[in-house]
Structure formats: C-alpha cells, structure tokens
Swiss-Prot record:
PANTHER family: SPERMIDINE/PUTRESCINE IMPORT ATP-BINDING PROTEIN POTA (PTHR42781), SPERMIDINE_PUTRESCINE IMPORT ATP-BINDING PROTEIN POTA (PTHR42781:SF4)
GO CC annotations on file: ATP-binding cassette (ABC) transporter complex
Listed name of the protein: Spermidine/putrescine import ATP-binding protein PotA
Span of domain ABC transporter: 10-240
Entry keyword Signal: no
Its membrane topology: Peripheral membrane protein
The organism of origin for this protein: Oenococcus oeni (strain ATCC BAA-331 / PSU-1)
Record: residues binding ATP: 42-49
SMART domains per record: AAA (SM00382)
Domain of life of the native organism: Bacteria
Subcellular location: Cell membrane
Role of this protein: Part of the ABC transporter complex PotABCD involved in spermidine/putrescine import. Responsible for energy coupling to the transport system.
C-alpha cells in the first residue's frame, strides 16, 4: 500500500485580496498543520485579520486559492467551514445568559437537548466557568466574557479556532493569565488555534509557529526562537523585540566589520565585502570597563524599567546602542560594550525568506 502524503489542514496558494486599487494581500503563501498554535503577528493594517477573515469565509480572495483539508473553499460559505472565530469584542448575546450563549451554535445545528446540555456543561468546565451557567453577560468580568466566547466557539466542535486579537481589551495581568490559559487549552484539546495579535510578547509566549505579516505579505515564518534569533530583515528584527541594528560589511565568512572594527560572528554564505545590517539584542550586551569592551561607548541616557535599566550609549562611530542592564550607569561616562560572536546576527539587504533559508542550510551543512 502506498503511504499517503500528509496534507496541510489549511493552505494559501498565491492568495491576493484587492479593494479596487488597494492591494490588501499580495500573493500570500502559507501552510497550517493540524494541532498547533499559530500566530499571525503584525502591525495594524498589515493584513493579519484579513487572512483570518479569508479562512473563516467572511471574505473571498480576488486571486489565488484557499484550501481546507485539500479542498478549494474560495466560494464555500462560512457556515460550511469547520472553523469558528472569537472576536476582540467577544460578540456575545447580551439578552442571553452564559448557558444560552454557549448553547446557541449547537441549537442552530439542531442538536438534541441532551447533547446540547452535555456540550455546554463540558465547554464551561473546560474554560473553568462551570458555576456560571445562570449568570447574565452583564454580571461577569471581561476575562470571564472572554472565556464564554471561547466556550461558545468550541461548542460548535471546530477543527480550527480563530482568535482575532481577543486579549487586547484586557488589563496587563489578566492578559498574561489568559495567554497561559489559551495555550494550555489548545494543548489539551489538540485542535488548531490561529491567533491574531500585534503584541510580539504574546506571539513569542504562546505560539508553536509565527507568521510575521507586513504590508499584505508574509515577511517571515518560523518558530518563536528562530524568528527572534534569526530575523530575516530590518522590519522583523525591529518588530520582534528590541534590536540594535547598525550598518556593516561582511568581509568574509564569519567576519564582519561595523563601527570601524572587525568582529568574528557565526554567519556565512555572503559575498566578500557585501553590505549588510548587523543585529545585536540589548540583553546580549554587557557594560564593562572600556579596556574589556569590544566597543567603546559614551553613556547617553538611562531609564529604570522595574527589573532592569534601559541604557542608551553612543559608540565612537556615532551608532546608538540600547543596553538592558541590571545596574545603573553614569550619564557621560566612558564604558565598554562586551558581546560574543554568537550574539551577532547578520542580515543581507532585501533577502527573500526562500534565499535566507537556503543560505542557512548551505553553511550549516558544512559544520
């Protein structure tokens, strides 16, 4: 017997969406596998919520193909897709109590009263609201309303749960709690979650896989660690966490020049003397006495952030460096910046994700 090829649960092939002359999505390709937590991460207006609307069927593409379980669904109505959406405003029915909100979907589908009751009780227990079934929506908190919205979506037994910035209206502490609860819920259920956010901390904390969206296209996709440690371009490096990005020249494999000096690094596969951008994260820099530093700097500014100090320093070539430090520094003081070769990440100018992956594979294969 021939072994079947495992197909993606959801696939975008060259998908575009235009509103007149405005190109909202530009030939997007992506694949979603079953049973993982995905995040569409990007700034406002980048196209991430549009991708969610295309998956759900609320919008239809003007070009390309959307496949769910291998079948083209470009014109398939929302109610015939095995997906459900939790919106930013939760979209709960204020005239119904918690129980009736969760029961709404199964009731519309014609489930028996017994099955509906079993489903509702099971879903409310899953989101830790089993004692809230008789409560009115106006009587529960924002975090509890968020859980009711999730329970209502899950009661329809979807293969995919779409979450459109559902945590953005919550306060910081509750948002952190809900991040953990959503991740735990996805792992327990084993279904696919696709989460939309502009908050990179949320994306890094919750996801198995991140699609970084900008200007209607996928800039980069990968695991949280890969995207943070190996950003493909200036936008990704700057958007995912804080980054020091300075111009440099790749002298040869594993040797880069920036700020007037040469430094060993762990990148390769570029042309000799190719112009590049150099990335070093603030947490990878240590402030030391000038003689121990690889770069000499002048402390320009600092601010206390509770668990650390954010220090701004200027090197002798005029580059500005952000440093995350446990101890304060004196403004105007001459200090050194210490870092290791593996802390330096090199980005080519205008490199595509395909070329980036190929280059990475080629020089990693030489090790």
């Amino acid at each position: 017997m021939t072994e079947e090829t495992v197909q993606p649960l959801i696939e975008f092939k060259n998908v575009s969406l235009d509103y007149g002359e405005t190109k909202v999505l530009k030939k997007v390709d992506l694949e979603i596998e079953e049973g993982k937590f995905y995040t569409l991460l990007g700034p406002s207006g980048s196209g991430k919520s549009t991708i969610l609307s295309l998956i759900s069927g609320r919008l239809q593409p003007t070009g390309g193909d959307i496949l769910i379980e291998g079948k083209n669904v470009n014109s398939l109505p929302s109610n015939q897709r095995k997906v459900n959406t939790v919106f930013q405003n939760y979209a709960l029915f204020p005239n119904m109590n918690v129980y009736d909100n969760v029961a709404f979907g199964p009731s519309i589908k014609g489930f028996s009263k017994k099955k509906i009751d079993q489903l509702v009780k099971s879903m409310l227990k899953l989101v830790k609201l089993d004692d809230f079934s008789d409560r009115e929506i106006s009587e529960i908190s924002g975090g509890q309303q968020q859980r009711v919205a999730i329970a209502r979506a899950l009661a329809n037994q979807p293969k995919v749960l779409l979450l459109d910035e559902p945590l953005s209206a919550l306060d910081y502490k509750l948002r952190k709690e809900m991040q953990s609860e959503l991740r735990e819920l996805q792992q327990r259920l084993g279904i696919t979650f696709i989460f939309v956010t502009h908050d990179q901390e949320e994306a890094l904390a919750m996801s198995d896989w991140i699609f970084v969206i900008n200007d209607g296209k996928v800039e980069q996709s990968g695991s949280p660690v890969d995207i943070y440690d190996e950003p493909i371009n200036h936008f990704v490096a700057n958007f995912i966490g804080e980054a020091n990005i300075v111009p440099g020249v790749m002298k040869e494999d594993y040797l880069v020049s920036f700020a007037g000096k040469d430094f060993k690094n762990v990148d390769a596969g570029m042309r000799t003397n190719e112009r590049v951008e150099v990335v070093i994260r603030p947490e990878d820099l240590d402030i030391v006495v000038p003689s121990r530093g690889k770069l000499q700097v002048t402390i320009e500014d600092q601010s206390f952030r509770g668990d650390s100090y954010e220090i701004t320093a200027i090197d002798d070539a005029g580059n500005e460096w952000a440093v995350q430090a446990t101890n304060p520094a004196k403004i105007g003081q001459r200090r050194g910046l210490k870092f290791d070769p593996e802390d330096i990440h090199i980005m080519r100018l205008n490199e595509s994700e395909e070329d980036f992956d190929a280059r990475l594979e080629s020089y990693e294969g030489e090790d």
